[in-house]
């Protein structure tokens, strides 16, 4: 996964957290004792989980030490783990959870065909695997990033599949399977705010791909110019 900057990501905390709130609200389980938040970032999603299930024992997991540090500082009462999601899913641990939750993280993790069944094994019978992945890779702002980057730019791959892929993968092992798509429209004040939004998410892998600060500055300048 790309490395993340918690301060940059949280510049738009309310907007970034809304899909997480909606996902948590769709999980109909009431008696939830244990939850793990995969790809918890700076803990904004973990806070939503705590509000949804206030009596639960909550664990946040992320492979970014800086994100976990920020999450632990903001919410020291929960358990925090620095670990890669694939490694966690492949670990033969017997620890299971009432809810395995992941908001806007698994699109950075490869091999969903093997990953999702492994994650599902960590859910207790009668529990829930609740996951949200963005599906806006073909939005104009995202397409523009790829147009500006040279073909030689090595950018971390985005992993997302059509809805029927996930249905076929999970239906036989699920008592109930809900799949839906929501489009979130964020009204931002100006072009600069749009660029700041994407610097905390979609632009991050592109900016990491450049070797020099000069290249990053040039890329951002061209992106800002063309997104107007």
What are these language model-derived features?
Residues 90-100:
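A short acidic, Gly/Pro-enriched loop at the edge of an enzyme's catalytic core
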């Amino acid at each position: 996964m790309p490395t993340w900057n918690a301060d940059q990501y949280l510049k738009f905390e309310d907007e970034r957290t809304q899909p997480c709130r909606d996902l948590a609200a769709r999980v109909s389980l009431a008696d939830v004792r244990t939850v793990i938040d995969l790809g918890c970032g700076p803990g904004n999603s973990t806070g939503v989980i705590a509000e949804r299930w206030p009596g639960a024992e909550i664990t946040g997991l992320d492979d970014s030490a800086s994100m976990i540090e920020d999450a632990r500082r903001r919410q020291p009462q929960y358990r925090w783990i620095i670990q890669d999601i694939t490694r966690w899913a492949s670990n033969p641990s017997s620890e299971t959870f009432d809810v395995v939750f992941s908001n806007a993280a698994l699109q950075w993790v490869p091999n969903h065909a093997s990953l999702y069944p492994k994650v599902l094994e960590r859910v207790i019978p009668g529990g829930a695997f609740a996951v949200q992945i963005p599906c806006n890779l073909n939005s104009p702002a995202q397409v523009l990033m790829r147009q500006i980057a040279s073909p030689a730019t090595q950018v971390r791959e985005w992993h997302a599949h059509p809805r029927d892929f996930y249905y076929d993968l999970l239906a036989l092992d699920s008592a109930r399977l809900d799949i839906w798509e929501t489009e979130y429209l964020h009204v931002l004040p100006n072009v600069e705010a749009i660029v700041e939004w994407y610097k905390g998410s979609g632009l991050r892998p592109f900016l990491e791909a450049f070797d020099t600060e000069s290249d990053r500055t040039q890329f951002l300048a061209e992106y800002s110019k063309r997104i107007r």
